Amino acid sequence: MKYMTSGDIHRMFKQEDEGTIIRRNNVRRIALENGIKNTLTQNIILIDSKDFFDKVNPYNLQEHEYKIPKLRCIKDCAREWNKHRKTGDRFIHADEIRDFLKTDSTVFKYKFGNKWIVNYDQLLPHLKRINRRE
């Protein structure tokens, strides 16, 4: 029985998946709601790691059999492209992506409140084509 803090468990998940939804508060809530062994010491919740991973991963899966799509808003798509662009590639503005998505039906997009949620993996080949046009 090895006890870990919620921050340690969060860092483990973040190391495997940068965009994970597991946060320190989520870890605490999961532990408290699912009856996972935990101890409170000096305002720190220590969680039994083996019990936690048994509850979170009951079938002991080691690998993903699927690829989780990168869902981003349009502004984040532009930011991610511009952050990871290669030398010689041009900056792409969010308005260019917005104009492209108005006429495109191949990229998954979903209006959520005031923002469009876009599948970045499907958008990436189109961004490469937009990059070649000047």
Positions of predicted regions on the chain:
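Extended, non-core accessory segments
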Residues: M1-K2, G7, R11, D76, ...
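Polyanion-binding surface elements
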Residues: M1-N26, E63-E96
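Generic alpha-helical hydrophobic packing signal
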Residues: Y3, L46, F52, L71, ...
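Major-groove DNA-recognition helix of helix-turn-helix-type DNA-binding domains
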Residues: E16-L46, H84-I117
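A short, Lys/Arg-enriched interface patch at domain edges and termini
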Residues: Q42, K50-K70, Y120-E134
